[in-house]
Amino acid sequence: MSTVTITDLARENVRNLTPYQSARRLGGNGDVWLNANEYPTAVEFQLTQQTLNRYPECQPKAVIENYAQYAGVKPEQVLVSRGADEGIELLIRAFCEPGKDAILYCPPTYGMYSVSAETIGVECRTVPTLENWQLDLQGISDKLDGVKVVYVCSPNNPTGQLINPQDFRTLLELTRGKAIVVADEAYIEFCPQASLAGWLAEYPHLAILRTLSKAFALAGLRCGFTLANEEVINLLMKVIAPYPLSTPVADIAAQALSPQGIVAMRERVAQIIAEREYLIAALKEIPCVEQVFDSETNYILARFKASSAVFKSLWDQGIILRDQNKQPSLSGCLRITVGTREESQRVIDALRAEQV
């Protein structure tokens, strides 16, 4: 009689699943953390709600109203969740039949689209971007049959560039009546003029993902948003957990989205952009750096000679970057989060010392 193990009892797709390799999961013993696109210094808040004996609101009113005002949409067009990652998953759960429907995304891009779909048992289709990392619209059109959700990250992680708005319009026309198009705007605060939030009235099948993890400097809070038309939001409300945000999270999020909080965020963005330009200019002069790509975000993608050796050398010095070698078309590439001036200087000095 064969013995059935606990692993045998698990779903086949979970047994075969490779979990998302988050920056924290990859570990390291660094003191210069430039691998997760976090803000480099902590922001401070005081808790104002002393009601931890009560369950929180499912969709905290102050958070929703503040975010709607900030994003220029109606409160009915906002859903708050445990990070934008939960929003990615909710869209698949609401719109995709496991074993029947598919999602589509365009690598090189963020890894959670595929992990969320595979966890739920939904097929993943990929259409790699063109050489300039823009959308291959013909390739997408050819693979749309049976696709219910299309994910497009703009600005794209890890490449750092915006998707051409005209290509977004073409994609939205291609998918009208067929699929939800999700614009992942996790980094939009660094290029706010490029947001698609103003397009919601025109495209009922558009959804937009946002987060407080980047420009708002609250990665540890785990608070994200989905912006969409009310019909989409109502469907997502059916599948979200009853209490997605704890009371302290909602309390701090509402403060971060106050008028003073928005001003502080914009000051942080200006500081990071200035530091990004300083770091880009320095990287271009370093012998082991082959190419530095333009960025609209708080990180820089660069191609290195002997990138694996460079990555390990900096790792051993306590400078933790993100290796992108396994991503399509990113051979030799490392991603560097823009940190403080001191952190930038540590990176620059370490790279200058590399004998490649």
Curated annotation (Swiss-Prot):
Any single Pfam family the record assigns to this protein: Aminotran_1_2
MF-aspect GO terms: histidinol-phosphate transaminase activity; pyridoxal phosphate binding
InterPro entries listed in its UniProt record: Aminotrans_II_pyridoxalP_BS, Aminotransferase_I/II_large, HisP_aminotrans, PyrdxlP-dep_Trfase, PyrdxlP-dep_Trfase_major, PyrdxlP-dep_Trfase_small
Keyword Amino-acid biosynthesis: yes
Gene3D superfamilies found in the cross-reference section: Aspartate Aminotransferase, domain 1, Type I PLP-dependent aspartate aminotransferase-like (Major domain)
Subunit structure: Homodimer.
Name assigned to this protein: Histidinol-phosphate aminotransferase
A single BP term in Gene Ontology: L-histidine biosynthetic process
Name of encoding gene: hisC
Biological or metabolic pathway of the protein: Amino-acid biosynthesis; L-histidine biosynthesis; L-histidine from 5-phospho-alpha-D-ribose 1-diphosphate: step 7/9
Enzyme class (EC, first level): transferase
N6-(pyridoxal phosphate)lysine modified-residue sites: 214
UniProtKB keywords: Amino-acid biosynthesis, Aminotransferase, Histidine biosynthesis, Pyridoxal phosphate, Transferase
Catalysed reactions, as listed in the record: L-histidinol phosphate + 2-oxoglutarate = 3-(imidazol-4-yl)-2-oxopropyl phosphate + L-glutamate
EC identifiers of the protein: 2.6.1.9
Top-level taxonomic group: Bacteria
Cofactor(s) listed: pyridoxal 5'-phosphate
Protein family according to the UniProt entry: Belongs to the class-II pyridoxal-phosphate-dependent aminotransferase family. Histidinol-phosphate aminotransferase subfamily.
